[in-house]
Amino acid sequence: MAKIITNLIRTAAIGLALAATSSHAQAQGYPERPIALLIPYTAGGPTDISSRVAADVASRVLGKRLVVENRPGAGGALAASNMAQNARPDGYTLAVTPITVLRLPHISTVAFNPITDLTWIINLAGYQFGVVVRADSPWKTWQEFTAYAKANPGKVTYASPGYGTTLHITMERIGERDGIKWTQVPFKGTADSVVALRGGHVMALTGSVPSEQIEAGIFRTLVTWGERRPVRHANAPTLKELGYGIVTNSPYGVTGPKGMDPAIVKILHDAFKGALDDPAFLKTLDRLGHDPFYMSGDDYFRWARENYEIERRTVERMGLKQ
């Protein structure tokens, strides 16, 4: 009997050793071909632009090209959802992942769980959100804008990435506080929202404050949503300054399918982390109105797990479940 147990232990040990050797060999040869990076918004938007620059940096480190594929939809959750359901955990399909993936399962029925079905690799940046209008609009301040909206229920239209996104929820929170009813007009990304605002199809835009349009005198920033005023928009107050008690920070990073080899995860983490030291990437973030926001894979996963519950409570409190 003792001999049988000894043999079983030996066999198990050999199996573990072979598995470790196979994993090591796989990681040593990785990557052997181009890697697909799914972007959750339309081409030409802020997340698309910053992600492409990060992908270029990672490509140089890895020695293989990251091929960007735009998968807009579901308020930014479609890319990660498609990856989680269809991709093999071999490191050749990744997704840029916004906070929407943590909220969507609480709003509607989805076919994946972002906590158990994703590998959280690295967080890279966070959005500087705010509300902007055209420079020729009649509203010079946030107070003027909200006064008009309150006096004209449902008349003010604003562009957002869709129902249940951080932008939609924050505008609803503001509306609850101020007794305002406004009309959300959903688009697949900021690029489309910018076009709509420039064309006069909506009255305001919520999202990453487009610095270039502000500096060119095309748009005017009425309010920002961060902890402090962005350097490029120092003339616009924050919601916090105005007494709302609302601070919105929405990180985004890179995830993969569940079950990825930890050695490959580290290779990818280190490749993308190089972007946070790259002048071109940092300059791009500044131009787009984003902040560098690093979280390691472990920290990113812990953050996701905590915020998954926070989002559940928010959806329940605001009655957003469909």
Model-assigned labels for residue ranges:
Residues 98-99, 135, 208-210, 226, ...:
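Short secondary-structure boundary segments
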Residues 1-7:
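N-terminal secretory signal peptides that target proteins for export/translocation
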Residues 192-247:
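Anionic-ligand binding region
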Residues 85-92, 105-192, 239-244, 249-284:
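Hinge/capping helix and adjacent helix->loop/strand transition within the periplasmic-binding protein
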Residues 26-117, 155, 163, 178-208, ...:
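N-terminal (or domain-start) structured segment
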Residues 32-34, 176-180, 262-322:
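An extracytoplasmic/periplasmic, membrane-proximal ligand-sensing/linker region
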Residues 46, 50, 54, 58, ...:
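Stable alpha-helical elements in mature extracytoplasmic
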Residues 9-21:
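Bacterial N-terminal signal peptides
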